Amino acid sequence: MSQLRKAPEGILGFPVAPFNREGKLEEEALYENIRFLLDEGLEAVFIACGSGEFQSLSTKEYEQMVEIAVSAADGKVPVYTGVGGNLSTALEWARISEEKGADGYLILPPYLIHGEQEGLYQYTKTIIESTDLNAIIYQRDNAVLTLEQIQRLTDLEQLVGLKDGIGDMALNISLSYTIGDRLGWLNGMPMAEVTMPAYAPIGFTSYSSAISNYIPHISRMFYEALLNGNDRLVKEIYEQVIIPINEIRKLRKGYAVSLIKAGMEIMGLHVKNTARPPIVPVEKEHCRQLENILKNAMARYPKTTAAL
């Protein structure tokens, strides 16, 4: 566990939770998938978050996933966990994260309730102050804090970043320009590569990458082209890979998670196209469409051409 008060930067890994056909967590597969992300150069691991089906995990499974992530990372990159939901569970899982050696956590929305700004502030503050771990706010769904509330939270040294999942660019510009480098700014929109051309210029130069779970070298090519001003390559990858995959993602609710698993299975990685309800597995026809996209992507952008 590191005490560095800084949000992770770059392409951030969000591993899925690999379940077998009976719905049991496959620990060895999770370890191998995390090692794959690290071998491909991802700058951090965010375990048991949205992509890891946080909402479906038991406390025992959560502990297992955190232990595996910390072991796989072996101190080479920071490990962040997902905490949130009802407050008592969030505090328990924050404590578990600290005990298991994580570096920080991503604070997910409270369960069900649409609170007032003061209530959301108190919810977030309580979790942040409960441990000495780094904390990242996640703006999404029923938990969207205003500039005023986030400025109040910056008084807490544990707060190191903000991840946006709503796409309110006016708010994002206000946040990043007003608060500046006091926080790290993360793009957490579904299929974040889609919006990175808009986010990077306003300081959101880090992002959670779904496709890095199965074609990380292409995500890396896109990211480096974006930062280096290679507009031709950005446009090409955008049109040939990112938009086609995103069009499939939008076909069903829950595909933001299950399409990752389908892509990993197609690419021969250690996961099956299974998910826990209410998320549904990817339908066969959509799997075939994704397979064709990936086949063409690998032919056009073979791994040896990636700048890793």
From Swiss-Prot:
One of its GO terms (biological process) is D-glucarate catabolic process. GO terms for molecular function: 4-hydroxy-tetrahydrodipicolinate synthase activity; 5-dehydro-4-deoxyglucarate dehydratase activity. InterPro entries: Aldolase_TIM, DapA-like, Dehydro-deoxyglucarate_dehyd. It catalyses: 5-dehydro-4-deoxy-D-glucarate + H(+) = 2,5-dioxopentanoate + CO2 + H2O. Keywords: Lyase. Its EC number is 4.2.1.41. It comes from the Bacteria. Belongs to the DapA family. This is Probable 5-dehydro-4-deoxyglucarate dehydratase.
